[in-house]
């Protein structure tokens, strides 16, 4: 079938606010608003090209598909389900009222063909779309979506390496895109200074405007002078520096500069679209990507090799160094850096004990558009979890420092048991009128039971099951059976084609009894799959959690 395929449109998209429906129910209004919110200019990295974040992570395959998704959601009945294939609406089928209203599959390829070369061929023919994680699953909330995970990582690194105190210390990193843009604020909240290298001035401007980064240095000498001053004063200030990390990190090594922590969150997962080769302008990079993609990929990976070698050099100095999930080690290894994996990924180094208890990036958004609805839910979280000072501290910092992007939203790492408790409470707040409109609850695909990614979330599993991807498939199937409002199954998010499979879930709190039943099922089952997955791998923390929570795991708890 021949269709027009427009990827650029000079238009501004914003989700509707308030209580007036544009669809037939809140269960279809919610995905409609969250799709549009993904493309809000205050949220998305390049909304006019449908790019939400992460290189080319899109919300819809092209503008014609976007228009048709919007039209279909507005007219979808309460017992119908829309199927979306790589950003294209392909079918509406009769299901039932407790079934998902939308089922999404993005970027999935048969394993032998699961590489960037084949994907890019399909993308050029308008046959596929890269959905990243929350771009194509319509639950991206801006950089806040990863702030707490990054904060938890920095805090745990501080506990392990610096006796829990990052005051007077600094983090060296790069990348200020939709994901990397969380790093400077997360470091500040954790008590550390940070130097954040970014090759696009527009991305720096975005983070300055949204208060995720505090200030910009004029050059490297100025940046180091600021770092020296602020660390001596014990101030946690974030500094952006315009430049190329593959040039600046080796220069810092040459100078003998010693940060207190080194990581990276450039879009290294996508060498064709997300990592600027040394000596190139961004305009040259984008133009040559169209005409000589193989040469561009080669040049980008050569620069990544220099970047990773510098990170290895910092590690040799004794600096805690870790990968933050962008697959840069893999790219460098393919370019000849044989020991690229000598420094660990952040999940096995700092986060896995949380995953073993089903704890991960629980998030919610206020469909009303009213920030007061989020502040009321913040208070409810504190009320229902009264003894978690760390969580209360996070919520206080988030309210003070995090600017809402698009529809007001909050992220809060909680696990099995508490997710359902909070979801049911939010639903009751909608029912009682305490909240002015329904709430949507979702999460990142980066969660305990929803992803297989051997170079990131499932790196170094103790039983060697890093690459087993049955788990995210089971997670998606169970959330569908449980009655989530929309469920997604993606490939390649975070680390690129061939390196991950993962699933997403969103559920609407509309204040009804039917919603309460769905919430209780979905928000219990979803984190429980994470406990199950880690218990199956032999982690004692997960096994104990499964027993404490009464999970029925036939080979473990029975």
From Swiss-Prot:
Protein name: Urocanate hydratase
Pathway assignment: Amino-acid degradation; L-histidine degradation into L-glutamate; N-formimidoyl-L-glutamate from L-histidine: step 2/3
NAD keyword on record: yes
Keyword Lyase listed: yes
Cofactor details (free text): Binds 1 NAD(+) per subunit.
Entry's Gene Ontology cellular component terms: cytoplasm
Similarity section: Belongs to the urocanase family.
Active site per database record: 412
Organism: Acinetobacter baumannii (strain ACICU)
InterPro entries: Urocanase, Urocanase-like, Urocanase_C, Urocanase_central_sf, Urocanase_CS, Urocanase_N, Urocanase_Rossmann-like, Urocanase_sf
Annotated residues for binding of NAD(+): 54-55, 132, 178-180, 198, 244-245, 265-269, 275-276, 324, 494
């Amino acid at each position: 079938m021949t269709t027009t395929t427009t990827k650029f449109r000079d238009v501004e998209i914003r989700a509707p606010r308030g209580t007036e429906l544009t669809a037939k129910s809140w269960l279809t209004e919610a995905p409609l608003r969250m799709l549009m919110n993904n493309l809000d200019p205050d949220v998305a990295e390049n909304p006019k090209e449908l790019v939400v974040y992460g290189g080319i992570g899109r919300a819809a395959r092209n503008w014609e598909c976007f228009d048709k998704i919007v039209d279909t959601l507005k007219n979808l009945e309460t017992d119908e389900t829309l199927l979306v294939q790589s950003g294209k609406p392909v079918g509406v089928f009769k299901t039932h009222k407790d079934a998902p209203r939308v089922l999404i599959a993005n970027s999935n390829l048969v394993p032998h063909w699961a590489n960037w070369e084949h994907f890019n061929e399909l993308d050029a023919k308008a046959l596929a779309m890269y959905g990243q994680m929350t771009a194509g699953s319509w639950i991206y909330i801006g950089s806040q979506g990863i702030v707490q995970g990054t904060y938890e990582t920095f805090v745990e690194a501080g506990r392990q390496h610096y006796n829990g105190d990052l005051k007077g210390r600094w983090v060296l990193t790069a990348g200020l895109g939709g994901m990397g843009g969380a790093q400077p604020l997360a470091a500040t909240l954790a008590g550390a200074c940070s130097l954040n290298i970014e090759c696009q001035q527009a991305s720096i401007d975005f983070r300055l405007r949204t208060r995720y980064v505090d200030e910009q240095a004029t050059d490297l000498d100025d940046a180091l002078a600021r770092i020296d001053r602020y660390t001596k004063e014990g101030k946690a200030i974030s500094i952006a520096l315009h430049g190329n990390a593959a040039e600046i990190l080796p220069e810092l090594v040459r100078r003998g500069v010693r940060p207190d922590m080194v990581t990276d969150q450039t879009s290294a997962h996508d060498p064709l679209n997300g990592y600027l080769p040394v000596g190139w302008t961004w305009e040259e990079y984008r133009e040559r990507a169209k005409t000589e993609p193989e040469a561009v990929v080669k040049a980008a990976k050569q620069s990544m090799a220099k970047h990773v070698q510098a990170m290895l050099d910092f590690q040799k100095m004794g600096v805690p160094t870790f990968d933050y999930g962008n697959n840069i080690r893999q790219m460098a290894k393919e370019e000849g850096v044989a020991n690229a994996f000598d420094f660990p990924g952040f999940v096995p180094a700092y986060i896995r004990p949380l995953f073993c208890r089903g704890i991960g990036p629980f998030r919610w958004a206020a469909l009303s558009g009213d920030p007061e609805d989020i502040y009321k839910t913040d208070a409810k979280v504190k009320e229902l979890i009264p003894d978690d000072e760390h969580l209360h501290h996070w919520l206080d910092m988030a309210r003070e420092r995090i600017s809402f992007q698009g529809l007001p939203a909050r992220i809060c790492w909680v696990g099995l048991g508490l997710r359902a408790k909070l979801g049911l409470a939010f639903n009751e707040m909608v029912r009682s009128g305490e909240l002015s409109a329904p709430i949507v609850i979702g999460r990142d695909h980066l969660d305990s039971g929803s992803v297989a990614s051997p170079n990131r979330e499932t790196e170094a599993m103790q039983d060697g099951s890093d690459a087993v991807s049955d788990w995210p498939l089971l997670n998606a199937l169970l959330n569908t059976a449980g009655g989530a409002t929309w469920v997604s199954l993606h490939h390649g998010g975070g680390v690129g084609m061939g390196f991950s499979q993962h699933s997403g879930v969103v559920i609407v709190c509309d204040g009804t009894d039917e919603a309460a039943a769905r919430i209780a099922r979905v928000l219990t089952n979803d984190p429980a799959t994470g406990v199950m997955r880690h218990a199956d791998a032999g982690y004692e923390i997960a096994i104990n959690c499964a027993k404490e929570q009464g999970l029925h795991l036939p080979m473990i708890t029975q």
